[in-house]
Amino acid sequence: MSDSVSIRAAVPEDAAALLAIYAPYVEHTAITFEYDVPSLSEFRGRIEKTLTRYPYLVAEIDGKPVGYAYAGPLKDRRAYDYCVELSIYVDETCRKHGVGRLLYDGLENCLGEMGITNLYACIGYPDIEDEYLTKNSVGFHEHMGYEIIGSFRKCGYKFKRSYSMVWMEKIIGDHLEDQPAMRPFPEVRGMLGY
């Protein structure tokens, strides 16, 4: 399936299609600790805000969005400019077909051009897998070169159950004494074909 997948930058008009991918994660899983599906206008605002500084990519098959991934600030302090937190959501009918890998490869390429050095993923983690949460996301990230660097025990409560959370990290750039300034996504997207 990954041969027929194209990756492009999101636009605010993608909000309805991407929200349709995200909503089942909110309603039926503990993959996100969000309880309520955001409104269309709120979700569109999230896309717009992200794109002012970071990449927000969409995977399509035959012009239909089947997944998305984006980067955001790790923390809101300038010293963290070279670190980002990633999020990824793939339509449940397209999982395990290479869509996530293509999205993350695209993000990593963008973020490397921006001067980002550290990638982080905050992942819900069950002590015992159940119908709401498995360890598949951790496995995906390990396959993509991430490693677990920390955990918060039973910090999320959803569906009358407590879930842990792990932080995973991947270093993609050199840490220099005179680190070049981070370049926002709008400055590099044209040269990357987005």
Q: What residue spans do the PLM features occupy?
A:
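Glycine-rich phosphate/pyrophosphate-binding loop shared by adenosine-nucleotide-utilizing enzymes
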Residues: 5, 64-68, 163
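A short beta-loop-alpha structural element at the N-terminal edge
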Residues: 6-18
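Conserved GNAT-fold acetyl-CoA-binding loop/helix
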Residues: 19-46
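Acetyl-CoA-dependent GNAT
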Residues: 37-93, 105, 110, 114, ...
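Conserved catalytic-core motifs of GNAT/GCN5-like acyltransferases
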Residues: 70, 122-124, 138, 142-162, ...
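Conserved acetyl-CoA-binding loop-helix of GNAT-fold acetyltransferases
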Residues: 96-112, 135-139
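Conserved GNAT acetyl-CoA-binding A-motif
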Residues: 111-133
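Short, cationic low-complexity segments
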Residues: 182-194
